[in-house]
Swiss-Prot record:
Any one GO MF annotation of this record: heme binding
Protein name, per record: Cytochrome P450 52A8
Organism (species): Candida tropicalis (Yeast)
PROSITE patterns: CYTOCHROME_P450 (PS00086)
Family: Belongs to the cytochrome P450 family.
Gene designation per UniProt: CYP52A8
Cystine crosslinks: none
Length: 517
């Protein structure tokens, strides 16, 4: 029998494939009937098992144009529901949804029907068991443990930013009159402020001889190489995410060395927190994340992993937000002028700057600053696309039937991808000028009822704990920039929209090249 199968493989294989497809179609129809679902209204197929579409996703990342391909090259239709296959999971379909009710169901009302899938496995070499990698009870425990930390740090965080801003300002003044990449400086600024917030001591990546400031000669925990190693490790995580089932192929020596150095650095501060006496912990001046967290848990790996999870979010999202913000301010002089007027009325400008009045509460009172940050996050969300994996056979409320108003089936193990970027640029929610960068829209009644059409910090139970942290940091830096400099200018020729680089978060592929005065 075996010999016959081998001999006639060219007959057996197509037959097995056909039988599998027939059974799958029957099983799908049966599930649709049980769950009251209808066929997907709009589908995108490449007629070659999803390989072509999957290759587009991978190649688009190489060209650093992932966001543009998703918005322009894929069909934007009324219900924005299509099915495409992602390499290498060629047997799993991925439904891409763009309807508020579907996103709400995915992230909130049907939260328990979906999980993060392989994220824990993909990210574990760097991030371990943390709030951004865990599902289920592990995630619930992490969130309960971390939530208080982001309620207590708000006021203290503002005052701790000024020393880092002074270093940032020195770099900018050094380049005054010439063009330079401020995005690179923002990434250094945010890693400095984030490590001080987390560990009580900054990596001081902004300190260098070009501004007459030097790091300590003693570097026994890898402080000098920490930021670069953390960046490189994240690049590998992004690749592991893209290749999914073949993640184990992305595990070379450079990746392992970066993880080792990052862990060594973090373990040093974890151990220092564990060695501190209760009296020493209470006497600490200012807020330190690790010193507060060690009061709740004594597990070294827990402390390290949670710290790195928070660092990933707190550093990269803030740097990206600031970079896109300055890009738009330099591209739109009238917006920069309005922002400076708002800052002047609240905190003064130049020599009349009242830095001591910049607080968590006073930043919230800056109406135009708030509108500007909202618009920046709308047009440039930190995580433009995300996905969830169905943990059981279920449905989403919209996208099926001839009119798109019927539920659609999502089978267990299937990936549901939702595009924050395309939702944020949808004229249905933001009007005919949705593609235009216009902060004033946030003072209009139409933006008060957006709900699930505006998700810069995700939504539902997994909504970002540190959103106020990010907004406060970005607001503080923009206020201080407005107080310190009169003009911002982009290096010509200006490419718009700018090319985006999407790894785990989004930034500008070519940097933010500006001139200040």
């Amino acid at each position: 029998m075996y010999e016959q199968v081998v001999e006639y493989w060219y007959v057996v294989l197509p037959l097995v494939f056909i039988l599998h497809k027939v059974f799958d179609m029957w099983h799908t129809r049966r599930l649709m009937k049980q769950l009251g679902a209808a066929p997907v209204t709009n589908q995108l197929h490449d007629n070659f098992f999803g390989i072509i579409n999957g290759w587009k996703h991978l190649s688009s990342r190489k060209k650093v144009e992932l966001k543009n391909i998703m918005i322009i090259n894929l069909p934007i239709r009324k219900f924005q529901v299509w099915v495409h296959m992602l390499v290498p999971s060629l047997e799993q379909s991925s439904s891409s949804q763009k309807i508020r009710r579907n996103i709400k169901a995915l992230l909130a009302t049907q939260f328990s029907d979906f999980s993060l899938g392989k994220r824990h496995t993909l990210f574990k070499p760097l991030l371990g068991d943390g709030i951004f990698t865990l599902d289920g009870q592990g995630w619930k425990h992490s969130r309960a443990m971390l939530r208080p930390q982001f309620a207590r740090e708000q006021v203290a965080h503002v005052t701790s930013l000024e020393p880092h801003f002074q270093l940032l300002k020195k770099h900018m003044v050094k380049n005054k009159g010439g063009f330079f990449d401020i995005q690179e400086l923002f990434f250094r600024f945010t890693v400095d402020s984030a490590t001080e917030f987390l560990f009580g001591e900054s990596v001081h990546s902004l300190k260098d001889e070009t501004i007459g400031s030097y790091q300590d000669d003693i570097d026994f925990v890898g402080r000098k190489d920490f930021a670069e190693s953390f960046n490189k490790a994240q690049e590998y995580l992004a690749i592991r995410t893209l290749v999914q089932d073949f993640y184990y192929l992305v595990n070379n020596q450079e990746f392992r060395d970066c993880n080792k150095l990052v862990h060594k650095f973090t373990n040093y501060y974890v151990q220092r927190a564990l060695d501190a006496t209760p009296e020493e912990l209470e006497k600490q001046s200012g807020y330190v994340f690790l010193y507060e967290l060690v009061k709740q848990t004594r597990g070294p790996n827990v402390l390290r992993d949670q710290s790195l999870n928070i660092l990933l979010a707190g550093r990269d999202t803030s740097a990206g937000l600031l970079s896109f913000a300055v890009f738009e301010l330099a591209r739109n002089p009238h917006i920069w002028a309005k922002l400076r007027e708002d800052v002047e009325s609240q905190f003064g400008l130049g020599e009349q700057s009242r830095i001591e009045e910049i607080t968590f509460e006073s930043l919230k009172r800056c109406g135009y600053l708030k509108a500007f940050l909202n618009e920046t996050l709308r047009v440039y969300p930190s995580v433009p696309r995300n996905f969830r994996i169905a943990t059981k056979n279920t449905t989403l409320p919209r996208g099926g039937g001839s009119d798109g108003n019927s539920p659609v089936l999502v089978k267990k193990g299937e990936a549901v991808s939702y595009g924050i970027n395309s939702t944020h640029l949808d004229p249905v929610y933001y009007g005919d000028d949705a593609a235009e960068f216009r902060p004033e829209r946030w003072n209009e009644p139409s933006t008060r009822k957006l709900g699930w059409a505006y998700l810069p910090f995700n939504g539902g139970p997994r909504i970002c704990l540190g959103q106020q942290f990010a907004l406060t940091e970005a607001g503080y830096v923009l206020v201080r920039l407005a107080q310190s400099f009169d003009t911002l200018e982009l290096k010509p020729p200006v490419v718009y929209p700018p090319k985006r680089l999407t790894n785990l978060t989004m930034s500008l592929q070519d940097g933010t090249i500006v001139k200040i005065d």
